[in-house]
Amino acid sequence: INRDIFSNVKFTFVRQKTQNGLGDAIAHSEHLIQEEAFAIILADDLIINNPSCISQLMKIHEENECSVIGVNEVPENETEKYGVISIDEPSSTNNSYVLKDIVEKPQSNAPSNLAVVGRYVLSSKIFKYLKNLEPSVGGEVQLTDAIKLMLNDEKVIGYLYEGTKFDCGSRHGYVNAIKHLAKEILDD
């Protein structure tokens, strides 16, 4: 590992004592975030691109001064695996969609085929919505539910990022990611 990359980086770990969902895990970090926007990167989604997916989302966040969620297009028969966004129309920025609604793992009639991936740049205002949430899907506090509440008060953009995504939460996706990265290394 190139240690120079991490020379100016500080890592802080916050432990979630019980697994009560992504929303609950994020709520535990409020004391570190305070009033700043922050990024969330879920490790089971590997996204390869330059600029990185988070860099793309941060650019949209800075241009629009609102929360931004990474999305990608999925086949209609796979929408029940993801949070899916509902939109009115694309915004003036290419690949950007102003969210009308967000639905966690819709079982039928998904509002679109734009699925949320594990990349977010969120306003610290999200903590206000996380505080009063009750467990929902899977008996967990869902980040999706907090974002849905946030939509009542402010704009949230779904950004169709550029890059290749691998679902490393499945064995098949993980193996495909390793094969892709190995091929890149061997081709260099």
PLM region descriptions:
Residues I1-I87, L122, K131-L133:
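Conserved beta-loop-beta/alpha segment of the NTase-like Rossmann-fold superfamily
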